[in-house]
């Protein structure tokens, strides 16, 4: 199989095979290393999309204990206020977090999104099969605020084909922002609301 022919379903089959053998820790390590291999392929211009990007560590390690944390309406209001107050928290980060909250997509689905996937006039995001976790293409409706946030993000993207291009020159061998960028940004926001119980970006989807 050619490297560009590897799809998320192949990664899923590989990880499930390891987990089914009773080795979830090994499956987690395999996911990390496989992700790095495909990232290297992107750096060397062998491919443009990492088929591992749709998978979280919990997908490799077997079933995760279900979290019951979600943000209440009051907490969401405080979150939006904190995003405007947090030192070093950019407008791009604010728009990104609002999109994650509104669309309930996985963070890597948004981090690696390209403008060609979006029909802003038709208010649809065409998420291609090679970037979805289950290997099926998905059409995601875009509410009016999301369309406006995306139009604003486009003004920040400097004609890049990526919705969220890498922001530092040393990181541009991977052309879009990495998913690890978002938890770091969220930590700046949480510092502005220390009395609110801990929450993660994954909790945005509940």
Language-model features, listed with the residues they occupy:
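Basic, Lys/Arg- and aromatic-enriched nucleic-acid-binding interface segment
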Residues: 18-33, 43-112, 121, 132-136, ...
């Amino acid at each position: 199989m050619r490297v560009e022919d590897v799809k998320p379903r192949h990664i899923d089959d590989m990880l499930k095979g390891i987990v089914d053998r009773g080795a979830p820790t090994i499956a987690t390590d395999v996911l990390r290393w496989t992700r790095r291999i495909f990232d290297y392929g992107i750096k060397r211009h062998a491919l443009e999309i990492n088929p591992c990007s749709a998978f979280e560590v919990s997908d490799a390690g077997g079933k995760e204990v279900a979290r019951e944390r979600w943000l209440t309406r009051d907490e969401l209001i405080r979150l939006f206020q904190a995003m405007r107050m947090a030192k070093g928290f950019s407008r791009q980060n604010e728009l990104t977090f609002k999109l994650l909250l509104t669309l309930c997509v996985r963070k890597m689905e948004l981090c690696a999104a390209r403008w060609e996937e979006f029909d802003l006039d038709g208010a649809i995001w065409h998420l291609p099969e090679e970037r979805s976790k289950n290997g099926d293409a998905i059409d995601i409706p875009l509410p009016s605020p999301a369309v406006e946030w995306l139009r604003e993000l486009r003004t920040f993207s400097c004609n890049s084909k990526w919705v969220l291009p890498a922001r530092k020159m040393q990181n541009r061998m991977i052309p879009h922002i990495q998913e690890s960028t978002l938890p770091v940004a969220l930590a700046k926001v949480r510092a502005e609301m220390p009395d609110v119980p801990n929450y993660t970006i994954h909790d945005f989807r509940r």
